[in-house]
Amino acid sequence: MKRFIPHTLLLAAALLTGGVRATAQMKTAYFMEGSVQRLDLNAALVPQRGYAAIPGMGNVGVEANSNFLSMRNFLYPAPDGDGLVTFLHGSVGNREFLRRMRRNNHLEINVRENLLGFGGYARRYFWSFGLNLRSESSINLPKDLFSLLKRLEPGQYDLKGTDITSDNYLEMAMGFAFPIRILTKEVTIGFRAKGLLGLAHASVHIDGMDIDLNDREWRADLRGSVNANVAGMNFSDLRGRIELQDVMDRLDPSDIDLNRIGSWGLAFDLGAETRFLDDRLKVSLGLNDLGFVCWSKKCGVGGTLSDLSFAYSGYDFDREELSTSTPDEIMLDIAPARNRTRMLKATLNVGGEYNILDERIGFGLLWQTRFASSFTSTELTASANFRPSPWFTASLSHSLLQNRLGVFGFALNVHPSWINFFLGMDYIGLRYGKYSDIATIPIGMKAINLHFGLSVPITKPKADGFKAATRARLHRRR
């Protein structure tokens, strides 16, 4: 058991820092004019050409972000200087470890896949359509949980505030962008309206988990709530006090009832961009995912966890098994079904880029703020953007607030007349360490993402319209 706890946390940290932030948006791509991915960051940042996304491959993004989960917080130099040891090792002091934990420790995992998408220029407008599958999950862990794991000393611990939430929905987005003149400045305005179809929602909230640890046993009393909503499922006959497993057994795809698909939502993206200093300085602002999802009671179930207690007696954390006395099942008191409305996690992007050498090189700064229901996170990303050719762009970035030096981002966009290929990551670590038999892993990163996109250019901008200046510059380069 002593080995299982740290290895589980290290596996999660390794997945976060070695292979998978949390809006499923690629910040390094913000100033890459040829990329289609910029539309997801700011509705006014339209690509240079119209496009048709390869179905299922137009924009695929996987992201994870945390304010605590990094290998640096769970692995420490060994006393003999040979390798690393976990936070449970005796050489790591309680205070040294716990000062790195937050009062509330967040982890977000988000996935976005573009199923269908296209966009093009018509007169002075750029129109776009996208059908996206989105998944947003979050976990909140209180500091007392890590205090319990580290200390394992007699006393009382309060783990209230533990939350697990997952929202999964289908997004249909229709957008357009157009230029307007404000005084002497030309401003590009972008707008996207989104219709949302709720697919699945689950949430677990722990109102109270009081743990009493002494020399003979440790006991836990749990109070909380569970809510779930799955499109097409029927939970209407579940009443009274039942086992939680009975709810799980209802999740059978063969029992989907199309009449019970009723969860829906609306959202909007807004964006603007303008230029100063003879077009050398570009300033933009984007607000994304301003909206909600209403989860229908027709396919929902919820209840409370109460009077749930369990105890471990005769434990020895150096053994693989524990002598336990636990309830045979987790009981759920079903509550009357009702509609539940949840706000989306909105994102504010404010960017500025200064260009030199006829826009072949640009230096950008992006301020991103993420508004979640229980917390707000902020990130500042600096980037150097290179455009040596009209069909090739590369960007190198560094996020200044959430990650340490030695973590950088890189994105590549190849967009000749017949293909548009994008690949990038916001967080690539340069510092690595070796722990036990686990492969070499990055240290110091709290977030990681991977984005990939493939589309086919279908049109070019018209001679008139708000891309005329850009097209003239591209023509001069040719």
What are these regions (language model features)?
Residues 25-478:
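Subset of outer-membrane beta-barrel
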